[in-house]
From Swiss-Prot:
Alphabetically ordered keywords of this record: Developmental protein, DNA-binding, Homeobox, Nucleus
Classification via PROSITE patterns: HOMEOBOX_1, HOMEOBOX_2
GO CC terms, sorted: nucleus
Protein name (Swiss-Prot/TrEMBL): Homeobox protein MSH-A
Taxonomic placement: Eukaryota, Metazoa, Chordata, Craniata, Vertebrata
Subcellular location, principal: nucleus
Disordered, as annotated region: 18-62, 100-124
Bias kind Polar residues: ranges: 101-112
Entry GO MF terms: DNA-binding transcription factor activity, RNA polymerase II-specific; RNA polymerase II transcription regulatory region sequence-specific DNA binding
Organism: Danio rerio (Zebrafish)
Length: 257
């Protein structure tokens, strides 16, 4: 009876241990399957958090690498710019040293063209007249400034020239004569102007008669004597002034110096 109870008790203990072991195995299996399930689910909270942490660490690492690369690029760029500047300054210094102090500009072989004068490319050269031809042309021009067609043909054949050459020479000679005439007329106008400068005025009028001078301007002077008569200024070749004339002994006439 007692043995039967002990056997039952032992079997119950074995079954209890077996059940607890089975339950623990089942718990372990459930935990493993849960962890597997948790790892296998990509949209779970843990997966999202772990992904975010990994992305943040990756982005920080990339930013750090980018900064390092940018710093390297800047240092390389600054070094290259400094090198270029030093090379340019060295070139300028060498050019200044090698350049002579007094550099003579190369002379141009061709004559310079005046910009104010129109140069014709197809202009014919001037005809080299001989001395005999020039004397004959001048003598003919003094006789007659305009030649007819027949006279020009005859005259050109006598000088062994073409009619065109004679015609052009007469045209140029008439233009020269006109210029000389205008210059002579201008010189004559300058010579015919009054000698006394318009800005130079005398303190008293020029009167030819003492009575007229006394009547016109005798009261404007504190002296009681009459105005002195003056001869016309046109007869004097130099401007008239106080130092150019003196009074005579009688005090009424003026004599040029």
């Amino acid at each position: 009876m007692v043995l039967t109870q002990n056997v039952d008790t032992f079997s119950g203990m074995i079954s209890a241990n077996h059940k607890s072991k089975v339950s623990s195995d089942e718990d372990d299996d459930d935990h493993g399957s849960r962890s597997v399930r948790t790892q296998s689910l990509p949209f779970s909270v843990d997966a999202l958090m772990s992904t975010k942490e990994r992305s943040e660490s990756t982005s920080q690492g990339s930013i750090h690498m980018t900064r390092i690369i940018n710093q390297d690029d800047r240092s390389i760029y600054s070094d290259s710019v400094d090198f270029i500047k030093r090379r340019e300054s060295a070139k300028e210094d060498s050019a200044w040293i090698n350049k002579p102090r007094l550099s003579t500009s190369p002379r141009s072989q061709s004559p310079t063209i005046c910009p104010l004068r129109k140069h014709k490319t197809n202009r014919k050269p001037r005809t080299p007249f001989t001395t005999a031809q020039l004397l004959a042309l001048e003598r003919k021009f003094r006789q007659k400034q305009y030649l007819s067609i027949a006279e020009r043909a005859e005259f050109s054949s006598s000088l062994s020239l073409t009619e065109t050459q004679v015609k052009i020479w007469f045209q140029n000679r008439r233009a020269k004569a006109k210029r000389l005439q205008e210059a002579e007329l201008e010189r004559f106008k300058m010579a015919s102007k009054p000698i006394l400068h318009p800005g130079l005025t005398l303190p008293f009028p020029l009167c030819t008669q003492p009575q007229t001078a006394a009547l016109v301007c005798g009261q404007s002077f504190p002296f009681s004597r009459h105005m002195l008569p003056f001869a016309p200024i046109g007869i004097y070749s130099t401007p008239m002034g106080y130092s150019m004339c003196h009074l005579s002994k009688d005090g009424y006439s003026v004599e040029p110096v």
